[in-house]
Structures are given as C-alpha cells and as structure tokens.
C-alpha cells in the first residue's frame, strides 16, 4: 500500500477517488486528521500522481464532478459537513465574477422598485443621437433583466463559465471577454430590435463559445465545456430564432456573443500554441 496524498476536505478526496475509479484505478480513503488516499497497486503510482496533478489544477472541472455518478456508488462511509452554499459560490467565483453578479442583482432590484422603463432610461443602449457619448450605455444593457427566471438563468451560467475563466485565465481575460461581447452583442441586437433590450445572455453565449473552443483546442488552458452543453446552446439559439417557445429572446445578441467567444478562443488558442 502506498499513500498518494492527503486532503483536508473529505469530499474532494472522494471526488478524486471516484474519478480514478472511472479510469480503472482503485484507491481507498483512510480518515485520520485528514483524508489519506492510498493505492494498493504501487505499479500505478506514476499514473495516479500524474492524474492527481491535473486534478489539483482544477478540482471543479465537470469531468470530476460527474465521476461520482459514473462510479455508481454513494455509500462512501464518509461523515463530513456539507459545503455551505456561499462557500461553494466563493470557491469558483473570483472578484470580477462577484462584482458582475452583485451589479446585476442591484439593477434587478432597482427595476422592481422604480420600474423597468425608469432604469432603462439610464442604462439602455443609446436610444437617441444625443446619448451616443454616454459610453456606459454600450455595456450596461447587460446588467438589466426583466424577470426572476431571466436573471437566475444568466447568473448561473455567468458564475459557472465566468468563474472558470477568471480562476484559470485571470480577471483580465474575463473583463476583456465581457466588454467585447457586451459591446458587439448589443450592437447587433439593437440592429434587430432597437435599443430596448437587456440581459447578460450575449456575454454568457460568448463565454460558452470561448470555454468550449478553448478547451477543445488548448486543453492545457484548464477550462472545459462538455460538447452536449454547446449543442444545447445552439439548439436554444435555433429555438429562439424560430420562436418555438413563444418567448421574447435577444437572438441577435445570442448569435453575436457566441461568434465573439469562438473568435476570441480561436485567436487565444493559436497564440498558446505559438508559445509552446
């Protein structure tokens, strides 16, 4: 028996053990002051340590989160406190991710108190030539949401995708993606529907495109999105385009945002390959 590593949190230890089980490697956990992970077949030590290094780089990667389901067991025998909800949020979200979430919530509350129209007069895309130099308007349309479902859906994806980008690639990269996608998706959407629109979905689609393509072309970046989710995003765009659900969707912003994210991921992955 060879001890591979120790984890302070038993759930993290179990996630790694479950993932290795899906790879055909059996590990066991012994509880002492920490959760010690042991390997019976020492000939596999080098492989396990290599997988451990990748796991420690991004333990929140979906492939690890899904491993417990694939392993097919829930009775681990572990006894530990669950992560508090806000602790789980903090673990994945950096400062930029948090600032955007708080800003969207504050604006949403203001819209409930003051009314949509009053807030849009201050934050909407320039709706009059005299407003074209109020530069914040080219970005603040992304902060406005018109229903609870609208804001919850967008902020969930923003936290999941934006948090991953910020944690792995830095706050600067998330800021650049956000500003460019908000600007260009807003420009396209106002050509489709005029200036009266809002929501973070253009930025969310940019992040979907970016995380998926960057993960496909540059796995070492540490970000990853399952192909099934990007297919879902494309189906949602098609459904919105043909009004299959009878909901008002910012189709122009969705398409433009996705295109921006894919383009930025393509350029960044090319640059990453050149540096190798």
Curated annotation (Swiss-Prot):
Localization of this protein: Cell inner membrane
UniProt keyword annotation of Cell membrane present: yes
Biological process annotations from GO: proteolysis
Bilayer-spanning residue ranges: 94-114, 142-162, 169-189, 192-212, 229-249, 250-270
A single Gene Ontology CC term: plasma membrane
Membrane topology listed for this record: Multi-pass membrane protein
Top-level division of the source organism's lineage: Bacteria
InterPro entries xref list: GlpG_N_sf (IPR038236), Peptidase_S54_GlpG_N (IPR022732), Peptidase_S54_rhomboid_dom (IPR022764), Rhomboid-like_sf (IPR035952), Rhomboid_protease_GlpG (IPR023662)
EC number: 3.4.21.105
RNA-binding found in the keyword field: no
Reactions the enzyme catalyzes: Cleaves type-1 transmembrane domains using a catalytic dyad composed of serine and histidine that are contributed by different transmembrane domains
EC class of the enzyme, as a word: hydrolase
Active site: 201, 254
GO molecular function, one term: serine-type endopeptidase activity
Keywords: Cell inner membrane, Cell membrane, Hydrolase, Membrane, Protease, Serine protease, Transmembrane, Transmembrane helix
Gene3D superfamilies attached to this UniProt entry: 3.30.70.2350, Rhomboid-like
Function: Rhomboid-type serine protease that catalyzes intramembrane proteolysis.
UniProt similarity note: Belongs to the peptidase S54 family.
HAMAP family noted in UniProt: Rhomboid_GlpG
Name assigned to this protein: Rhomboid protease GlpG
């Amino acid at each position: 028996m060879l001890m591979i590593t120790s984890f302070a949190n038993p759930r993290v230890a179990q996630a790694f053990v479950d993932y290795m089980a899906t790879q055909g490697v059996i590990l066991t956990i012994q509880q002492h002051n920490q959760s010690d992970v042991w390997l019976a077949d020492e000939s596999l030590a080098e492989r396990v340590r290599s997988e451990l290094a990748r796991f420690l780089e991004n333990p929140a990667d979906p492939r690890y989160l899904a491993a417990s389901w694939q392993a097919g067991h829930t009775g681990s025998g572990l006894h530990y406190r669950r992560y508090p909800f806000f602790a789980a949020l903090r673990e994945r979200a950096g400062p930029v991710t948090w600032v955007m979430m708080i800003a969207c919530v504050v604006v949403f509350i203001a819209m409930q108190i003051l009314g949509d129209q009053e807030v849009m007069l201050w934050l909407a895309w320039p709706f009059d030539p005299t407003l074209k130099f109020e530069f914040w308007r080219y970005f603040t349309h992304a902060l406005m949401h018109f229903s609870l479902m609208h804001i919850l859906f967008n902020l969930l994806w923003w936290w999941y995708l934006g948090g991953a980008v910020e944690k792995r690639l830095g706050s600067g990269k998330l800021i650049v993606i956000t500003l460019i996608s908000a600007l260009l998706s807003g420009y396209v959407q106002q050509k489709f529907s005029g200036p009266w629109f809002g929501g973070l979905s253009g930025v969310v689609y940019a992040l979907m495109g970016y995380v998926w393509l960057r993960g496909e072309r540059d796995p070492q970046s540490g970000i990853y999105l399952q192909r099934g989710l990007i297919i879902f995003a494309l189906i949602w765009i098609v459904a919105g385009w043909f009004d299959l659900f009878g909901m008002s969707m910012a189709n122009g912003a969705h398409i433009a945002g996705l295109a921006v994210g894919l383009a930025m991921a393509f350029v960044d992955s090319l640059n990453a390959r050149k540096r190798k």
